[in-house]
């Protein structure tokens, strides 16, 4: 009673489908399990059924979900779904007791002379499969598995519903079965095509079909072609388009275009109001223009360049000027041909409606009459046997192994990442952005018209009219203006920081100038990055590579060419990478790491390398000179005190201090001002003034040894210049480096410094003896 009441009161019938597909073999030990019921199932598939779009959407979504988690691209999922649909439906009969039936089995009885699966619950739990099975002959079936024919490679990620622990020989073909409420009929195929066309073009579908035929061979080609024709097999002819129907289509399209515009103002309101007014005045003219082919190139009658530039900005139209009159999707005004992007044909036609147009006499007669014949010829070319049999190797029929990815969200994309990390083997390098140069389009407010007389007529489009510098946030903005750009301008912005800082800088800039709107996204035309190689024991070896490096005379660094980008290497393992960002930057870093790893006798202190890279990632900034020296000598002192056997304990101590924030620092207090955006603050001359220290009445820069100088470099400078006071401490440090390092250069250099200190001690002792004798 309760069930009948619930069925009567249910207003919308639910078609919720379980998307969990399973794998069932169609060949077992040379037995074809599908042959017995193929004819009867074909009759069932071909019968007319009631069409429910909700049910069809659920079925095709379950087919999409069978692609597996490793196929993340929707287009690839659509291709795998298409391949399964081309191989077509398949059914496998079986005998099963009622208490063992689940929702993958459909009740259906056939008398089978050939093989029938007898399935029963897997009580042994030898695997995750639901059923065990045996093969019977001359018996009737009680239930049936229904799904789509597939290949073993496509179903490698799907769980088997039958236990195959015993020695069972199969075939490359298998079945992807779905729950019994996801039945597939041939009447659904044209509707499946509508769903596939959301992600695939007709050319993609044809190429995928050709590749599948070439991959599987001629034996299955007829089966694939039949299901391919069923996809395009609408029985009912589409109704003829009437004027009222075209009016509805046009109104709907205008509404879609209106909502696709990101920002509305007086410019966009005027554009759509004029289109609507002309549609009310002359519907025939507007509808004819709306369907105008891209091959026809009309001429605009009245044209306002200032208004047109604002429309292209706010409507996000991609327009180029050309001189050829044979380019599609274009219109001309005077002698200038304006070409829009091939995907913006509707916008081209709306611009023609807005400004009005005329056609040449030969264009009116020739191009419109030959339009249908051109389409017919293209269809014949596309369906020709030669192009139909072409094989495209870009699409693979093997599903990649599943790897769970956790992508880091970066506002603005990878081009605006503050840090770019690349790992090769055990070596990791962190590249930090020092500054970016971006180009942005902007619309000016109406106040610009009061200063038009100040703009000289001799200006060109590449002339910098204004250059403004801001201290907070620190950026430099160069404005390019020409004598015909009174409403728009191009901005060249030099700034450092993430995407949020860039948006904040645009807001600050807008407060000081007559900018009405910025048009994002911005184009990053140049990006400079800096990196440090941590833990490198012999830092000079990076600048001694052959074949891939060369020196320049007017700049104190070595240039290494990687991916056609000059990577500059300073002393102490510090590098700079110009021009590139995002994925290109990662490729350059990886090539450079591979090149460095091929250097013979190169040695890294991997514990120190891991600690310093972790400190960089924690602070999202390069480690300053003083903090790094304090960190390295604190660790070196602990290693000397605890001994080499307690090296892991020292590593955990330093790791604990990093995690507790003992070595955290502020980005604004970095001593090396070269990595700050100082050029925008005080100019390039004062930007090179690095803070200095006074030692023995001499001024020295804090980074005179290099920001990334290691312990051996600092000890060499102190010992050779005699800046030490407690020799015992320096001897212990040098002895530890000489005995623990695996690098021959470090051992030799440490022993040399020890001998230098020993000889210096003898010299001082002999001078004291002579002084005592004289007294």
Swiss-Prot record:
Stored InterPro entries: Herpes_UL87_C, Herpes_UL87_N
Signal peptide: none
Record Pfam families: DUF587 (PF04532), Herpes_UL87 (PF03043)
Family assignment from sequence similarity: Belongs to the herpesviridae UL87 family.
Protein name: Protein U58
Gene name as annotated: U58
């Amino acid at each position: 009673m309760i069930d009948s009441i619930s069925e009567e009161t249910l207003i919308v019938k639910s078609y919720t489908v379980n998307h969990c597909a399973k794998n069932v073999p169609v060949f077992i030990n040379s037995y074809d399990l599908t042959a017995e019921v193929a004819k009867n199932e074909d009759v069932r598939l071909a019968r007319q059924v009631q069409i429910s779009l909700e049910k069809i959407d659920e079925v095709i979504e379950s087919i999409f979900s069978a692609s597996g988690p490793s196929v993340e691209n929707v287009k690839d999922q659509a291709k795998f779904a298409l391949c399964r649909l081309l191989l077509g439906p398949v059914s496998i009969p079986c005998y099963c007791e009622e208490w063992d039936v689940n929702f993958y089995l459909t009740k259906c009885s056939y008398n089978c002379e050939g093989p029938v699966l007898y399935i029963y619950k897997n009580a042994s739990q030898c695997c995750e499969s639901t059923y065990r099975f045996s093969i019977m002959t001359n018996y009737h079936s009680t239930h049936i598995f229904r799904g789509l024919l597939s290949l073993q490679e496509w179903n490698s990620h799907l769980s088997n519903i039958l236990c195959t622990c015993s020695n069972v020989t199969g075939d490359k073909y298998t079945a992807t079965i779905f729950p019994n409420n996801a039945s597939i009929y041939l009447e659904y195929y044209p509707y499946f095509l509508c769903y596939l066309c959301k992600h695939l073009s007709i050319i993609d579908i044809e190429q995928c079909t050709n590749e599948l035929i070439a991959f599987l061979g001629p034996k299955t080609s007829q089966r694939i072609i039949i299901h391919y024709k069923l996809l395009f097999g609408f029985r009912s002819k589409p109704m003829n388009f009437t004027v009222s129907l075209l009016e509805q289509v046009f109104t709907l399209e205008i509404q879609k275009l209106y909502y696709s515009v990101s920002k509305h103002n007086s410019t966009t309101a005027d554009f759509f109001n004029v289109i609507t007014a002309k549609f009310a005045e002359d519907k025939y003219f507007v509808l004819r223009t709306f369907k105008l082919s891209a091959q026809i190139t009309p001429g605009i009658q009245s044209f306002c360049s200032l208004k047109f530039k604002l429309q292209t900005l706010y409507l996000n139209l991609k327009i180029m000027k050309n001189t050829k009159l044979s380019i599609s999707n274009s219109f001309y005004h005077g002698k200038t041909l304006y070409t829009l992007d091939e995907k913006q044909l509707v916008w081209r036609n709306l611009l023609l409606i807005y400004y009005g147009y005329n056609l040449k006499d030969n264009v009116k007669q020739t191009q419109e009459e030959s339009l249908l014949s051109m389409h017919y010829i293209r269809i014949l070319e596309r369906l020709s046997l030669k192009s139909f049999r072409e094989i495209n190797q870009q699409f693979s029929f093997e599903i990649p192994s599943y790897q769970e990815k956790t992508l880091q969200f970066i506002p603005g994309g990878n081009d605006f990442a503050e840090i770019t990390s690349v790992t090769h083997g055990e070596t990791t390098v962190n590249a930090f952005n020092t500054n970016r140069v971006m180009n942005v389009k902007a619309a000016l407010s109406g106040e610009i018209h009061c200063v038009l007389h100040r703009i000289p007529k001799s200006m060109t489009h590449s002339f910098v009219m204004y250059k403004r510098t801001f201290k907070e946030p620190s950026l430099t903005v160069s404005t390019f203006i020409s004598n015909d750009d009174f409403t728009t301008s191009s901005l060249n912005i030099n700034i450092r920081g993430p995407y949020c800082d860039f948006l904040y800088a645009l807001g600050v800039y807008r407060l000081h100038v007559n900018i009405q709107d910025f048009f994002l996204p911005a184009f990053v035309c140049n990006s400079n990055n800096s990196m440090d190689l941590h833990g490198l024991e012999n830092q000079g070896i990076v600048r001694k590579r052959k074949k891939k490096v060369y020196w320049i005379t007017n700049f104190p660094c070595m240039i290494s060419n990687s991916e056609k980008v000059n990577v500059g290497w300073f002393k102490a393992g510090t590098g700079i990478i110009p021009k590139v960002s995002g994925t290109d930057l990662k490729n350059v870093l990886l090539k450079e790491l591979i090149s460095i790893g091929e250097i013979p006798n190169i040695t890294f202190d991997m514990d120190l390398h891991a600690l310093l890279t972790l400190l960089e990632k924690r602070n999202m900034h390069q480690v300053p000179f003083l903090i790094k020296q304090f960190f390295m000598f604190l660790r070196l002192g602990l290693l000397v005190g605890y001994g080499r056997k307690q090296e892991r304990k020292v590593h955990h101590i330093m790791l604990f201090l990093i995690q507790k924030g003992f070595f955290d620092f502020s980005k604004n207090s970095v001593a090396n001002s070269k990595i700050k955006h100082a050029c925008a603050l005080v100019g390039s001359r004062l930007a090179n003034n690095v803070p200095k220290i006074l030692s023995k009445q001499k001024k020295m820069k804090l980074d005179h040894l290099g920001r990334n100088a290691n312990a051996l470099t600092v000890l060499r400078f102190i010992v050779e210049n005699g800046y030490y006071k407690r020799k015992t401490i320096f001897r212990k440090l040098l002895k530890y480096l000489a005995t623990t390092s695996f690098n021959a250069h470090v051992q030799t250099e440490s022993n040399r410094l020890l001998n230098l200190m020993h000889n210096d001690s003898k010299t001082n002792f002999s001078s004291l003896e002579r002084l005592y004798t004289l007294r």
